[in-house]
């Protein structure tokens, strides 16, 4: 699977050490990620690793092991919420950069209510912060939304209608506010804004609609689950 990602048409790839990895497999996942980063030909892709969250027993070792890799471009911090944590992580990346001329970039996954509330301060928390991602799945859980699919509003959530011709309803209206908050913070601090994935990846129409909406809002990119959609 990692080899397919390296040879895909994607502009960027992130290797996951967090949600996709069971607790008992964390160490092996880190070793696999390091091997792939150093061994595979990634071309001109941006290569990122999603590390575990602040407070995890795994994050310190992950950061120390990844910080000096020459072919790695960034780490993605999930559940970013507090300025002090982001600032400290940025300093750790700089301290452990080894022979790199510059420290790794730090990308932030905004996926909780507190993260959205603090997003402006998080965007400015450290000079290494380069991008803000919207984590729609965990955000839904954070606010108590009854969503069945990542990236879709709950079935019971709908507008009653409006007379205005320019009123547009989409399945993602529930997420318009956090998406805009994240986008505004990214633009204010000259960062990239990346939308989260559309969970029902076999639904090509839904995936396209989700990507088009994010692009229309001004987002710079979108996470995808399947390489089939790299052309979007």
Task: Label each region the model flagged.
Residues 1-232:
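Expand to "…catalyze enediolate/carbanion chemistry for C-C bond making/breaking, isomerization
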């Amino acid at each position: 699977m990692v080899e397919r990602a390296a040879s895909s048409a994607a502009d960027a790839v992130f290797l996951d050490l967090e949600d996709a990895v069971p607790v008992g497999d964390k160490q092996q996942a880190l070793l696999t990620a390091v091997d792939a980063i150093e061994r595979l030909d990634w071309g001109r892709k941006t290569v990122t690793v999603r590390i575990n969250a602040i407070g995890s027993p795994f994050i310190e070792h992950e950061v120390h092991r990844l910080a000096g890799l020459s072919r790695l471009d960034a780490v993605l911090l999930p559940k970013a919420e507090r300025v002090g944590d982001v600032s400290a992580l940025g300093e750790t990346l700089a301290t452990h950069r080894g022979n790199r001329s510059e420290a790794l970039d730090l990308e932030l996954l905004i996926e909780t209510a507190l993260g959205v509330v603090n997003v402006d301060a998080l965007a400015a928390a450290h000079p290494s912060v380069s991008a803000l991602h919207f984590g729609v799945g965990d955000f839904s859980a954070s606010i108590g939304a009854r969503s069945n699919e990542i990236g879709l509003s709950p079935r019971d959530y709908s507008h009653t209608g409006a007379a205005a011709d320019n009123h547009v309803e989409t399945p993602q209206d529930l997420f318009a506010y956090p998406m805009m908050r994240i986008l505004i913070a990214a633009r204010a601090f000259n960062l990239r804004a990346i939308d989260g994935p559309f969970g029902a990846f076999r639904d090509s129409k839904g995936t396209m609609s989700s990507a088009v909406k994010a692009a229309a809002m001004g987002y710079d990119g979108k996470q995808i689950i399947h390489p089939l959609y790299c052309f979007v």
